[in-house]
């Protein structure tokens, strides 16, 4: 199954119980959920590695008898065109100090990430989900403008950790086949404590 494009990326900060932090000050919003979209000029790339563990061949009687497979260790190289400044800093653990500054406070906070793409042939939605991990920003390049702008995208690395809701695995893939898939159920698994928005009665 081939996939094409990036439809969107959603992130949230999570607590020690892998529950979304529903607080605009301590988390990313009142609901805890932050959808990266047109206001951030969208996601450019979300390159996922480590979906399978490394393998070691097992030999016996001068023959290859088996393969021992390690655990998956996913990481996402995530590039956003213009991620909200405060959101970016909160995700990597730089918290506002009330004086216009942002400084690292303790350990890097844990976060969750959901990447949406679609199939080539029939445009069915596919989601790569990470319910627990840490976000880092290893570097920041700054360059002079010439006759052209020199832009530096927001480039972050998400390192996935074990997620309880995924049966102890580090990631889960969802496929919107139009029958079994329920988006609210997916959101509740990926973002622990998520509640679907209520549409006011007319």
Predicted segment positions?
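Polar/acidic, low-complexity leader/linker segments enriched in S/T/G and N/D
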Residues: 1-43, 199-202
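Oligomerization/assembly interface segments of phage tail-like spikes and tubes
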Residues: 63-87, 150-163
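Short, surface-exposed beta-strand/loop "edge" segments at domain boundaries and coil↔beta transitions
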Residues: 19-21, 86, 117-128, 166-168
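N-terminal, charged/glycine-rich beta-strand/loop interface patches
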Residues: 44-66, 70-76
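Short helix-loop boundary/capping segments
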Residues: 104-138, 143
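Charged, amphipathic alpha-helical segments
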Residues: 83-104
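Catalytic micro-motifs at enzyme active sites that drive phosphoryl/nucleotidyl and oxygen chemistry
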Residues: 62-68, 99-103, 140-147
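Mixed-charge, glycine-accented linear interaction segment located at domain edges/termini
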Residues: 133-202
